[in-house]
Amino acid sequence: MSAPLSVFVTGTDTEIGKTFVSAAMLHGFARHGLRAAALKPIAAGAYERDGVWRNEDADQLDAAANVALPPELRTPFLLKAPAAPHIVAAQEGVTLDLDTIVACHREALTRADVVVVEGVGGFRVPLNDTQDTADLAVALGLPVVLVVGVRLGCISHALLTADAIRQRGLTLAGWVANHVDPAMSFADENVATIRDWLARERRAPLIGRIAHMTPAAPESAAAMLDIAALVESLRTARH
C-alpha cells in the first residue's frame, strides 16, 4: 500500500471559500477511490448544540469526508469567538501548540489515504506572539494548495502568497480559482494571468475553476476539480 497523501489548504484571504474548496476536494478524493479525512486544526467561531461545541466549517468538512475523525482529533483547538485566532486564544486562555496539531495529523494519516488540512484565514495569520499559519504548514511539512478568491485584487494576492509559500521552503502543489464575485469584470483574464505566472514561476498547475454557486455545493464543485492531476502533484511533491 502506498504511503498516505496530505495537503495543506490555504487562501489568498479570509472568506474566499477555503472550506468550500476543501470540501470539494474531499468529495473528489472519495470519488477517486480514496479514503479521505479532514483536519481543521484551529477553528475560531463555535456554536453549542446538544451540549457540544461545534464549528460550521468543521461540520462542512465532516459532511464531505468519507473517513470520520473524532472532533478532538479533527479540531484540537476550537475557539468560541469568530475572530483572529491569536486574539481569541489569548482571551480564552488557550495556547495554540503546533506540536499538538502535528501529533493529530500523524494520527489522522494512520486512518486515511489522504488528509486535507485546512488552515485558518490566509497564509500568514498569527497564532501566537511568534508563530503563524505558515509555521504550521512548515511544521506539518506539507505541499500547499492555494485557493484564490477571484475578485478585484486577486492577481497580486495570489502571487504574493505564492512567494510566501516558496520562502518557507514549501511546494505549491496547485491552485484553485474560486469565483466569489459573480459581477467581476475580466474574470477570465485575471485567472489566465495567475495561471500563466504560477505555471512559469512555480510550476504550479491550475487544479480547477469553480463557478460562483448560490448556495455553495461542494459535491457539485468537486466535478470542476482535476483530482487526478492533484493526486499526481501531491505524489510528486512527496519525493
Swiss-Prot record:
InterPro entries the record matches: DTB_synth_BioD, P-loop_NTPase
GO BP term, example: biotin biosynthetic process
The organism's place on the tree of life at top rank: Bacteria
Keywords noted in UniProt: ATP-binding, Biotin biosynthesis, Cytoplasm, Ligase, Magnesium, Metal-binding, Nucleotide-binding
Root EC class: ligase
Reaction catalyzed: (7R,8S)-7,8-diammoniononanoate + CO2 + ATP = (4R,5S)-dethiobiotin + ADP + phosphate + 3 H(+)
SUPFAM superfamilies: P-loop containing nucleoside triphosphate hydrolases
GO molecular function: ATP binding; dethiobiotin synthase activity; magnesium ion binding
Record Pfam families: AAA_26 (PF13500)
Active site: residue positions: 40
Similarity remark: Belongs to the dethiobiotin synthetase family.
Function: Catalyzes a mechanistically unusual reaction, the ATP-dependent insertion of CO2 between the N7 and N8 nitrogen atoms of 7,8-diaminopelargonic acid (DAPA, also called 7,8-diammoniononanoate) to form a ureido ring.
Record's protein name: ATP-dependent dethiobiotin synthetase BioD
Native organism: Burkholderia orbicola (strain MC0-3)
Gene: bioD
